[in-house]
């Protein structure tokens, strides 16, 4: 594979995460405007965004098999057509049913693109370099999550209709579409060139189960925590601005942490540093929940920094449990993480209704403790050392 081809594929991976980050995180910015557009209360409008999450979940789950049937380049190009149709549907329709369908299609497109992006990184890079590259790729999710809400605020402040925000997000997919030209993708399944030697099917091992549970608990814990921090802070008497600043501080340090750890991870055994980071994150979250108001910004900043590498490290370790990175295995762990996203309000909503925001934060803290236990247990069964040692960079 030529170096220019590798660079193009890597940029497709970066932009695939930016696309999903933009679609998921911009929701909160435009929800009120969309509710006004359809003359609905915000509470009932928020339910329609479940179609976006459902699309992401279904596409990541199905793409484990789809990758072996439909070439990756064909998927990305067809995805561009679907993206154009979905954005056009948002622009020219006043029907709530069509809006929900367009959101579902956007979810499908971003889920397929993100799973392809993750798979490309696991194919292009080996050993410890894979972990650092995947972490840098994941930082594009957070970066888009910072940039596109600002774009949305800029457009909405000038009374420009909300659907132009999605047209701007579509430009990210346009860049992916352009990059597919003159670019060779790894072939899979029936499209792959088969060698004379029979392909040995590898068993995943119990380590994959530990990592899948860790992925689900981590995402559910993280989103359950950060979703209720503003309510918890307001309950302590903090202003709305100060409560919002806590969330901004978390994501800002999360992004800086991703950049820092994309360099740091190369020098450590991934399972060991993951266990340390999961333990530190659980302790820092507990200190945030039980600490004084004066110390809360510091605890959430350090929590964001030290927890930033956890999810990507889980995916990387998963890809290293087999000798050859398996798209089905990587997508299985991604699917478990996405299920965590879907369950966020299903799990935390009733807890908050019954016992208040602090109970939701303590539940999230308990989930982080489960992540630590899973990562610690993985140390006894992980195969990553025997699979990554020859290729460590």
UniProtKB/Swiss-Prot annotation:
Residues 32-50, 99-100, 155-161, 227-244, 294-297, 353-360 are periplasmic. The chain crosses the membrane at residues 11-31, 51-71, 78-98, 101-121, 134-154, 162-182, 206-226, 245-265, 273-293, 298-318, 332-352, 361-381. PROSITE patterns: MFS. Keywords: Cell inner membrane, Cell membrane, Membrane, Transmembrane, Transmembrane helix. It is found in: Cell inner membrane. Belongs to the major facilitator superfamily. TsgA family. Residues 1-10, 72-77, 122-133, 183-205, 266-272, 319-331, 382-393 are cytoplasmic. GO terms for molecular function: transmembrane transporter activity. It is a multi-pass membrane protein. NCBIfam families: PRK03699.1. This is Protein TsgA. GO terms for cellular component: plasma membrane. InterPro entries: MFS, MFS_dom, MFS_trans_sf, MFS_TsgA, MFS_TsgA-like.
């Amino acid at each position: 594979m030529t170096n220019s081809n590798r660079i193009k594929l890597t940029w497709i991976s970066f932009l695939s995460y930016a696309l999903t980050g933009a679609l998921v995180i911009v929701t909160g910015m435009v929800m009120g405007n969309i509710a006004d557009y359809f003359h609905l209360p915000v509470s009932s409008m928020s339910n329609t965004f479940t179609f976006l999450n459902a699309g992401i979940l279904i596409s990541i789950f199905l793409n484990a098999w789809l990758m072996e049937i439909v070439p990756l380049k064909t998927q990305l190009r067809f995805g561009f057509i679907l993206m154009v149709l979905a954005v056009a549907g948002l622009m020219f329709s006043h029907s709530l049913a069509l809006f929900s369908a367009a959101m579902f299609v956007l979810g499908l497109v971003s889920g397929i693109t993100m799973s392809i992006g993750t798979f490309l990184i696991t194919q292009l890079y080996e050993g410890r370099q894979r972990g650092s590259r995947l972490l840098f790729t994941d930082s594009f999710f957070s970066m888009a999550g910072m940039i596109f809400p600002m774009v949305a605020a800029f457009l909405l402040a000038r009374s420009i209709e909300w659907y132009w925000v999605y047209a701007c997000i579509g430009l990210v997919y346009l860049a992916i579409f352009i990059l597919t030209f003159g670019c060779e993708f790894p072939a899979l399944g029936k499209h792959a060139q088969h060698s004379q030697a029979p392909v040995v099917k590898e068993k995943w091992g119990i380590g994959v189960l530990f990592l899948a549970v860790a992925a689900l608990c981590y995402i559910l814990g993280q989103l359950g925590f950060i979703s209720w921090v503003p309510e918890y802070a307001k309950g302590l008497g903090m202003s709305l601005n100060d409560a919002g600043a806590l969330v901004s501080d978390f994501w800002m340090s999360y992004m800086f942490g991703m950049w820092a750890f994309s360099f740091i991870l190369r020098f450590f055994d991934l399972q060991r540093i993951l266990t340390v980071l999961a333990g530190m994150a659980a302790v820092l979250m507990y200190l945030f929940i039980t600490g004084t108001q004066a110390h809360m910004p510091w605890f959430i900043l350090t929590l964001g920094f030290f927890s930033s590498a956890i999810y990507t490290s889980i995916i990387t370790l998963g890809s290293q449990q087999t000798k050859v990175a398996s798209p089905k295995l990587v997508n299985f762990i991604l699917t478990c993480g996405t299920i965590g996203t879907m369950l966020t309000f299903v799990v935390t909503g009733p807890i908050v209704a019954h016992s208040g925001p602090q109970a939701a934060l303590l539940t999230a803290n308990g989930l982080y403790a489960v992540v630590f236990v899973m990562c610690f247990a993985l140390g006894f069964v992980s195969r990553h050392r025997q699979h990554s040692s020859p290729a460590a960079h």
